[in-house]
């Protein structure tokens, strides 16, 4: 009964929102940091070690953001949290982060670095090895790539966060007896 009252009083929404915004800003900063270090994650010829570093810095921090929010909310609830509440908390972070990362990718590709998508398209054309249909398809999609990239990132982060939230909620749940 006491846990239900605490759950009604303390909602994870504000915490999830703050963590998701922080992660989205971190993602943009990470893009520029990797560029500064000479690691272009859009380069198809990027060495495996650099790809792993970029993925760990991106997805690893995303996973930690979800788990951090679940643990913090569990502490707010007095050290107890139901599976459903832990999952909901993690999924809110994932959904918000997906939305914010998608919006920041739009900002990045349309305002901050419009040439980034041209580099990706040029690399895809080069990889097509003169296949006329592939080149024509890439050229047709060039103007819409920013939409697919932003939408794809939003969906990917949300779905990945859903899976992480399911797993971490099972680990972190602790109900009063």
Give the label of every model feature segment:
Residues 124-145:
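Short membrane-interface loop/juxtamembrane segments of multi-pass integral membrane proteins
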Residues 53-60, 108, 150-158:
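Hydrophobic alpha-helical transmembrane segments of multi-pass membrane proteins
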Residues 103-128:
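Functional transmembrane-helix hotspots
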Residues 64-69, 148-177:
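Transmembrane alpha-helical segments in integral membrane proteins
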Residues 21-25, 90-103:
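Selective transmembrane-helix segments that form parts of the transport pathway or gating/packing helices
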Residues 1-66:
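Transmembrane alpha-helical insertion/packing segments
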Residues 66-85:
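Membrane-helix interface/capping segments
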Residues 30, 34-38, 70-74, 104-109, ...:
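Membrane-water interface at transmembrane helix exits
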